[in-house]
Amino acid sequence: MKKIVFTGGGTVGHVTLNLLLMPKFIEDGWEVHYIGDKRGIEHQEILKSGLDVTFHSIATGKLRRYFSWQNMLDVFKVGWGIVQSLFIMLRLRPQTLFSKGGFVSVPPVIAARVSGVPVFIHESDLSMGLANKIAYKFATKMYSTFEQASSLSKVEHVGAVTKVSDQKNPEPDELVDIQTHFNHKLPTVLFVGGSAGARVFNQLVTDHKKELTERYNIINLTGDSSLNELSQNLFRVDYVTDLYQPLLELADIVVTRGGANTIFELLAIAKLHVIVPLGREASRGDQIENAAYFVKKGYAEDLQESDLTLDSLEEKLSHLLSHKEDYQAKMKASKELKSLADFYQLLKKDLS
């Protein structure tokens, strides 16, 4: 039986594509393994998926671009993770390793290359993260979401592989209940802050609940169960799974962070959106670059977190609603999306 090892973690964005691909390989008779951190979100997501995947936990260390005494300890953690991954590779003898990035992926990638296992990696952002910059040196091939990343010799631009489609789904009962609290004459705004929510969105909704719900139906994915609420023109919930796409379909506009997975999902369904990227003080600036790219393409509006107020947000929302057809036409004309089936066939071809 052919074997494939997946790796990637730290955030949901570093796991999502793996979760989409693994069932395909299982259906085709592959034995699927995953290397990650049992304390990480990658382990939680695999357990929730119920997939027949063998999980191997290794030591991990965070990769930092700045000086920290913690770096010294993490060097040893990464080194031990490489040794652990090497033993896993030598024991399994897989046909390939597929990495979605994140600091947990570096030891398996290095170990795979050392043991002669072909390495395929995927980069979602406009500029590579530190983990993928290291992994690229050991990779057989890298697939990129953005065109600008394709100047490197081992990179193939494939566009975004998204988990949503523009196909309408039957409304779940929970959504019907939510809509009974909404005013259908008002536009619906969905705040999405990633897997852990976004405090800045939560605070904005909390501080301006009255003004917002007078003008919009508000859906706020908070990441914080203490904020859960269903009231007139307002639905706040910490986390959703099956309800995620129906909520996207219900929304007229989405206010989101600038993670590549989320904004390309919105592009796939031509959904109006305002991107409020994480600033450079909280990230390496990849979300700012992603947002600027989408604005340049005419897909979205952006708003820096430092400039986010009720007035500035309403200005962006009003502009999008007034120019809805223009934005949607540009999104629908985009050639930057690839279906899961097409990407899977491409990957299998490269593995052969």
Curated annotation (Swiss-Prot):
Gene Ontology molecular function, alphabetical: undecaprenyldiphospho-muramoylpentapeptide beta-N-acetylglucosaminyltransferase activity
**Keyword terms of this UniProt record:** Cell cycle, Cell division, Cell membrane, Cell shape, Cell wall biogenesis/degradation, Glycosyltransferase, Membrane, Peptidoglycan synthesis, Transferase
* Coiled-coil annotated residue ranges, if any: none
Q: Where does UDP-N-acetyl-alpha-D-glucosamine bind?
A: 195, 287
Q: Where in the cell is it found?
A: Cell membrane
Q: Which reaction does it catalyse?
A: Mur2Ac(oyl-L-Ala-gamma-D-Glu-L-Lys-D-Ala-D-Ala)-di-trans,octa-cis-undecaprenyl diphosphate + UDP-N-acetyl-alpha-D-glucosamine = beta-D-GlcNAc-(1->4)-Mur2Ac(oyl-L-Ala-gamma-D-Glu-L-Lys-D-Ala-D-Ala)-di-trans,octa-cis-undecaprenyl diphosphate + UDP + H(+)
Q: Which pathway or pathways does this protein act in?
A: Cell wall biogenesis; peptidoglycan biosynthesis
Question: Which GO BP terms apply?
Answer: carbohydrate metabolic process; cell division; cell wall organization; lipid glycosylation; peptidoglycan biosynthetic process; regulation of cell shape
Quote the Pfam families the UniProt record gives.
Answer: Glyco_tran_28_C (PF04101), Glyco_transf_28 (PF03033)
Write down the membrane topology.
Peripheral membrane protein
Cite the InterPro entries for this sequence. Answer: GlcNAc_MurG (IPR006009), Glyco_trans_28_C (IPR007235), GlycoTrans_28_N (IPR004276)
The yes or no answer to whether the keyword Translocase is present is no
Highest taxon of source? Bacteria
Query: What EC number(s) is this enzyme filed under?
Result: 2.4.1.227
Q: Which family does it belong to?
A: Belongs to the glycosyltransferase 28 family. MurG subfamily.
What's the protein name?
UDP-N-acetylglucosamine--N-acetylmuramyl-(pentapeptide) pyrophosphoryl-undecaprenol N-acetylglucosamine transferase
Source species of the chain: Streptococcus pneumoniae (strain JJA)
